[in-house]
């Protein structure tokens, strides 16, 4: 029985008029809809919450369909025979922009949309499939159509944090499709507010707030900027969100092994398949592997290699009744253990067929508290070594996404603004090298460089609060007033079967760590990009909220900071900055660029960077020097 029943092609066209990407040649895109049919009785599928309640076709299978997008070499013989399936992040494609250092666009069609062409020059076939039922089909976002469980009711919990005062808020994360309330007058619905992170929730009297319609709430006086609001209410007819795992798996299965007669545009062209996910979709990958759902209905291990990126130690509401796959709340079912490799990959070990995994994180995943749980025991008292089939890397001194130069004024996803200028370190070259290392590991048996992360044993794993004195000594710096760690949570007796009780019972916080720092305030542990090895600034993975957006002093969830060194020794002595000035480090711009070139070559030799990125790294360092000098001058004037 076929898992993919049909590819409905809407568009198929050659990219850029046939312009070649190096030796790979021209690429084409295929855009369409994939139709699926899954066996609900299959032992693996019984893990999908409520699949037994889903409507079935005459063959007893559950049908669903998702948006499909494919980039492939026109001549498959010129490709590398590798599929990279990029799990969309909240409906958006990410692989081309992060690996190719390109702008993020929904339908890459112009030369600039492919950046440096890395994935294409290396011959990858890149695919996407919509996997979220709650994604609106707007701005090219990709979604999954799944059955709804008609007549099933239950509780939903939504969290919102506005950056400005607003009169109403939707019952969904960001722009996603809400679960509507079943009763506008529901007296059991609850709204709580916390004035800042870590504060005790205060219940808002029911008379002070209301459902303005089935998908929005309103509050007397409006919702305050920076405050954290949670609403718990009843809804009906939940989507079968867990089918997203099967959509991702079966798309790759079909592309790898289905014959040309089935309409497979990649028939016979793919030898290997790799799975990539960033942030929310990185957590999706961890959850998928935890369930062992990288194995298809025929018992084949679909993915040879997996790259969960900036997913931290969490999973998500990806297999929950009334689950919100886009939810980014820390106190969610996605923050339940297990966290480290021993627990997350237990099912893979038992079956004996295991993909190679390279897990990468940036610094904010450590400062929010969950990333260190990947490589400690549950009590945070000892290091837990990664499994032999895993490499774990911290990209030291980075923020959640590659730093832009010049930096953005606000987070492009959330609109959040920081007190400090955002982190400008570009970790994309590290990510490109990680993919090459994964491919060589799978294809040639060449093991990647050893894992690099903060360790208790060597003192590089420290509590975040211990770093406050150093950062506080840097003039003009605002260190977070509160470090909030994830807590032990209890979502009730039915959580194991995918039904959560709200609010959860919260226990003691976990013991978590960040990397220690050097004399410049830059992180010691992890893979250090050239920006840290030849520094012009302190690059942190933390930033605090802009006071104009409320809750000043609260930690931002995804952005770091760039704290430029003083320009001259006189600037350093006048301001009392504990860090050496730029002029004391480098005799000239040329000397600085030579240092960048030297340290980049060392990273290439260690296989942390690729030789093809050397000149691009030096060119960016040239621009970084100019920008940092501008920022150093501005800072010196403001402190004089």
Where are these regions (language model features)?
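C-terminal His-loop and adjacent cap/lid subdomain of alpha/beta-hydrolase
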Residues: 2-640
């Amino acid at each position: 029985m076929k898992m993919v029943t049909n590819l409905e092609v809407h568009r198929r066209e050659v990219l850029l008029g046939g312009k070649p990407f190096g030796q790979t040649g021209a690429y084409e895109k295929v855009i369409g809809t994939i139709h699926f049919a899954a066996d609900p009785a299959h032992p693996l599928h019984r893990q999908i919450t409520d699949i037994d309640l889903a409507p079935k076709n005459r063959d007893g299978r559950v049908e669903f369909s998702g948006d499909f997008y494919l980039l492939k070499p026109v001549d498959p013989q010129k490709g590398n025979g590798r599929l990279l399936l990029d799990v969309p992040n909240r409906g958006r494609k990410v692989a081309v922009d992060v690996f190719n250092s390109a702008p993020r666009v929904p339908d890459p069609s112009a030369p600039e949309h492919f950046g440096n062409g890395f994935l294409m020059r290396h011959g990858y076939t890149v695919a996407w499939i919509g996997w979220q039922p709650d994604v609106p089909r707007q701005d090219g976002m990709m979604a999954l159509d799944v059955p709804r469980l008609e007549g099933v009711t239950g509780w939903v919990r939504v969290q919102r944090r506005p950056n400005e005062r607003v009169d109403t808020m939707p019952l969904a994360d960001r722009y996603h499709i809400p679960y509507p309330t079943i009763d506008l007058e529901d007296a059991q619905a609850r709204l709580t507010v916390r004035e800042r992170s870590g504060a005790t929730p205060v219940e808002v009297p029911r008379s002070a707030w209301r459902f303005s319609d089935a998908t929005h709430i309103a509050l007397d006086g409006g919702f305050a900027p920076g405050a954290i609001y949670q609403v718990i209410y009843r809804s009906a007819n939940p989507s079968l969100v867990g089918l997203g795992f099967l959509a991702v798996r079966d798309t790759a299965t079909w592309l790898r092994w289905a014959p040309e007669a089935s309409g497979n545009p990649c028939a016979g062209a793919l030898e290997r398949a790799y799975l990539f996910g960033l942030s929310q979709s990185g957590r999706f990958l961890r959850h998928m592997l935890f369930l062992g759902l990288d194995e298809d209905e025929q018992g084949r291990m679909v993915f040879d290699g997996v790259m969960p990126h900036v997913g931290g130690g969490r999973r998500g509401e990806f297999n929950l009744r009334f689950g919100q796959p886009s939810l980014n709340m820390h106190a969610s079912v996605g923050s339940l253990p297990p966290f480290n490799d021993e627990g997350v990959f237990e099912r893979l070990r038992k079956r004996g067929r295991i993909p190679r995994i390279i897990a990468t994180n940036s610094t904010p995943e450590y400062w929010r508290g969950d990333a260190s749980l990947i490589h400690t025991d549950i009590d945070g008292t000892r290091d837990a070594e990664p499994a032999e089939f895993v490499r774990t890397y911290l990209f030291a001194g980075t923020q959640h996404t590659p730093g832009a130069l010049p930096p953005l004024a606000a987070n492009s996803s959330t609109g959040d603004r920081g007190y400090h200028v955002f982190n400008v370190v570009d970790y994309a070259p590290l990510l490109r090298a990680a993919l090459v290392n994964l491919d060589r590991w799978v294809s040639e048996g060449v093991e990647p460089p050893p894992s690099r992360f903060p360790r208790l044993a060597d003192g590089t794993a420290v509590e975040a609060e211990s770093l406050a004195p150093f950062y506080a000594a840097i003039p003009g710096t605002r260190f977070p007033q509160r470090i909030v760690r994830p807590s032990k949570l209890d979502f009730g007796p039915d959580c194991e079967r995918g039904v959560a009780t709200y609010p959860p019972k919260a226990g003691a916080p976990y013991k978590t760590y960040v990397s220690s720092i050097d004399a410049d305030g830059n992180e010691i542990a992890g893979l250090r990009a050239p920006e840290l090895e030849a520094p012009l600034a302190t690059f942190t993975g933390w930033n605090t909220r802009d006071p104009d957006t409320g809750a000043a002093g609260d930690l931002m969830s995804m952005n770091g900071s760039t704290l430029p060194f003083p320009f001259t020794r006189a600037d350093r002595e006048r301001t009392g900055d504990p860090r050496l000035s730029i002029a004391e480090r480098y005799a000239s711009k040329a000397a600085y660029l030579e240092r960048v070139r030297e340290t980049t070559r060392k990273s290439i030799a260690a296989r942390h960077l690729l030789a093809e990125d050397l000149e691009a790294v030096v060119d960016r360092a040239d621009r970084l020097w100019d920008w940092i000098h501008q920022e150093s001058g501005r800072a010196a004037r403001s402190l004089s």
